Amino acid sequence: MLLKDKTVVIFGGSGAIGRAAALAMAKESARIFLAARQADKLEKAAAEIRAAGGSVETLQLDVLDGGQTTAQVANLAGRTGGIDIVVNATGFLHNQGKTLAQLSLAEYHQGFVPFLDAQFTIAQAVAPWIGGEREGVIITTIPPSATMAVPGHLGHIVGCAAMEAFIKALARELGAKNIRVLGVRSHAIADAVLAGSYTAEVFATKAQALGLSVEQWLGGAAHSTMLQRLPTLAQIAGVITFLASPSAAAMTATVVNVTAGATLS
């Protein structure tokens, strides 16, 4: 019961990582609130958690709409008496594969603008309602590219690096309020594509350019890691749950490397 009676808000809660994290945290007796844009996907995710015996409610919102996000979070916090844990598992379609000569400015921006806007909007919306006497935790999931130099990933690399920098800067700003800020850096997740992740479309573009199927591309990605395998949704969810727990109470301003050795911290 690592998270007994904790109020957890998961943005991107209908996605593959968000659902996995919700299931793992619900098993530790957390009270789960899933936030995402599409009502049908939200309800499907919530039904999965209820079927496993978890406590869950949903919030339909767009994290790129700051006013909407702030209002819904404030309403939730008013009902629950505050928020303990926030997970940002949002993701946005972007290009991976086009080089400088092929990339438009709009495609370049798509690699980082929505990711950073979501990170800011979520942090600004939740910060007034966490911390103080009840410790607060903000955890963001991040792709691995911040420390990579891979052709065809200009916007994506910039976005990942900026997300990691934001985590460290925000941790310094919110630490005095008893709020920890952390990141989970994952490689491509082995079973996320089958779980309906938007990354299936992102990976398909890269795979097609190489004359590969998505499955073949994932196999190559696995062999490129030190462990010769990719992380799984359950493993990522387990790390998120640990970071949110009292066992990680001394951790902040940290990005945890869960890339199976694809990157070095």
Where are these regions (language model features)?
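Short, small/polar-rich loop/turn modules that mediate ligand/substrate recognition or access, typified
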Residues: G175, R180, M251-A253
